[in-house]
Amino acid sequence: MAHEAMEYDVQVQLNHAEQQPAPAGMASSQGGPALLQPVPADVVSSQGVPSILQPAPAEVISSQATPPLLQPAPQLSVDLTEVEVLGEDTVENINPRTSEQHRQGSDGNHTIPASSLHSMTNFISGLQRLHGMLEFLRPSSSNHSVGPMRTRRRVSASRRARAGGSQRTDSARLRAPLDAYFQVSRTQPDLPATTYDSETRNPVSEELQVSSSSDSDSDSSAEYGGVVDQAEESGAVILEEQLAGVSAEQEVTCIDGGKTLPKQPSPQKSEPLLPSASMDEEEGDTCTICLEQWTNAGDHRLSALRCGHLFGYRCISTWLKGQVRKCPQCNKKARHSDIVVLYARTLRALDTSEQERMKSSLLKEQMLRKQAELESAQCRLQLQVLTDKCTRLQRRVQDLQKLTSHQSQNLQQPRGSQAWVLSCSPSSQGQHKHKYHFQKTFTVSQAGNCRIMAYCDALSCLVISQPSPQASFLPGFGVKMLSTANMKSSQYIPMHGKQIRGLAFSSYLRGLLLSASLDNTIKLTSLETNTVVQTYNAGRPVWSCCWCLDEANYIYAGLANGSILVYDVRNTSSHVQELVAQKARCPLVSLSYMPRAASAAFPYGGVLAGTLEDASFWEQKMDFSHWPHVLPLEPGGCIDFQTENSSRHCLVTYRPDKNHTTIRSVLMEMSYRLDDTGNPICSCQPVHTFFGGPTCKLLTKNAIFQSPENDGNILVCTGDEAANSALLWDAASGSLLQDLQTDQPVLDICPFEVNRNSYLATLTEKMVHIYKWE
């Protein structure tokens, strides 16, 4: 009857709690929702029946704006259910006297009647309705969740709690038969101290677990377990905090007098994400010998061999101590001393296969691009060579056509008839309307020692050899540039260590000057950059030089022993041919190149070389070989040898001898005849002789050139050392046209043309005299 009365009171209290509205005092002063709290222990009825849960008084609500929590009910004398929170501290019973009395009463009843079970079911239903009311009053937490949450039913935990109820110790049986309490575990972020409203409330986890404390038999336990499962499935949803969640936990415990003390929330800590299990199973983290993961400490720590493969230290050490002392992966020889311990926590290979593939593609593309550029350059070079060759062949065809048209006339006329024609031409018999008039004088070197001149038509400048103007600071010899456009001299360009004996400009390469010196070298100097671009060492003093007019890349250098060295400007090391002197080994005082097929009377091309004793014509063959022809000149006394390419004439100068008391300049016409085998024999025939002064101490260079009148006549200019003048002759008539006076003996003569005006320059040791044809 006592049990039935107790059950009836419980049911009445439950119904009363459902119908009674919450008092207005429950509202929080901060605006937060008031939570239900169990009544204190002194409200329990005299029959020992609890009054179930009543609204908590207003003073229980935290004044620091912390959300009010559900407080556990005090210890009652009804052995109904046991509510626990797994993983948290157990709320101890503060009133052992009531529990002891109920324990003694409950020891006598080991079986629960059907009415008691029905009362328990009603009681649990009331708890579920209270839980629904709490959920209705609780604000939505979907927008205030701190971290990822998950729900988990703790059915197994409640069953373990029921199973352990029958095995309690004696100290556990001293507890109250009705050991029911609530513990709401919430984790919340730190709240501001200003206000508290429904938005700041952020519950994270809440557990409500009902367990049985009865010592009944197995049937009652099973029946009671079903009731608990039904209660949990209907409303007791447990929220737990996951590993990545950052939260703080509040615990509420029950003490004497019904007061509650909330535990302060622990500081929030961010825990790093644990590595996934799949990373531990990767092949790169396991030893290939034992197929287990290596460690960063201990006897199985990460180690490597000289070949680079990774193993555990214990495994590879045991492996190498055996008979097979090779790497388990690549079979390379290894020793125990080759083991190297790697101090690394983890290893992870970066996938660079795509990057390496792109690099290889880039290298391949660059290689193909370079190959294409090289092929393009080769094609351009071949095109240039073929274009030059085609131009030369076209020019030769034109010359051969002229030769064919005049062949009959040349066969009918005797040798020397052309000289008679020149002397009898009407233009040569009449007086010249124009003369050379003195224009200007330039001082080249105060110290003297100037020797030779050359004119560059592409740059419109005249270069004169001279010693260095600052011999103490920069000794040697060079050239001074004289602009013919404004008739002003410019800078000095140093070139050689000794006196310069020959200067010549290329007809194909712009501004490239060839110079020969007594310092055993020939040099190529660019006047566009004023720098020496190539130097050749001839081994002997070089007296003269010239360019090949049929092949733009070949040059000739006349040595002191009478030999001629042939150089290819594309070969920077040494000469490609050497033409040995045929007779006397005397210095080559002059070299002049006569291009092939320049005239129908003499179609062959080659270099004319004049020494102090004789002269030779080196015929150039198609394979760039040279065949010598000794010219029939007077023996001894030759000091200069000049050519005129258009008319195929040459001018040979002799010094005075016992048979001739003055300087003689003989105009020669180049000729040829065929021998029995059909090979040509080159020779020359005298046309006119021009006489000068009786003195010849200097090797004066004379000039033979076309008349500025462009009438086909040829002019000859010779130097006269005795009179300090330059004599201008008409080659057709042999008559003297002008006597150009200077202050010193003339050393070199150079005609040139600028802006359709013809000029003549004469060089002495210190000065240059400019004359204009007017």
Curated annotation (Swiss-Prot):
Changing residue 499 to A: Does not affect interaction with the RPA complex and subsequent recruitment at DNA damage sites. Disulfide bonds: none annotated. Changing residue 46 to A: Markedly decreases phosphorylation following ionizing radiation and abolishes ability to stimulate p53/TP53 ubiquitination. Residues 150-162 have a biased composition (Basic residues). GO terms for molecular function: MDM2/MDM4 family protein binding; p53 binding; ubiquitin protein ligase activity; zinc ion binding. It is found in: Nucleus; Nucleus, PML body; Cytoplasm. WD repeats lie at residues 495-537, 539-577, 583-628. Residues 361-413 form a coiled coil. It is linked to Fanconi anemia, complementation group W: A form of Fanconi anemia, a disorder affecting all bone marrow elements and resulting in anemia, leukopenia and thrombopenia. It is associated with cardiac, renal and limb malformations, dermal pigmentary changes, and a predisposition to the development of malignancies. At the cellular level it is associated with hypersensitivity to DNA-damaging agents, chromosomal instability (increased chromosome breakage) and defective DNA repair. Interacts with MDM2 and p53/TP53. Binds to the RPA complex via direct interaction with RPA2. Interacts with RAD51. The coiled coil domain may be involved in RPA2-binding. This is E3 ubiquitin-protein ligase RFWD3. It comes from Homo sapiens. The gene is RFWD3.
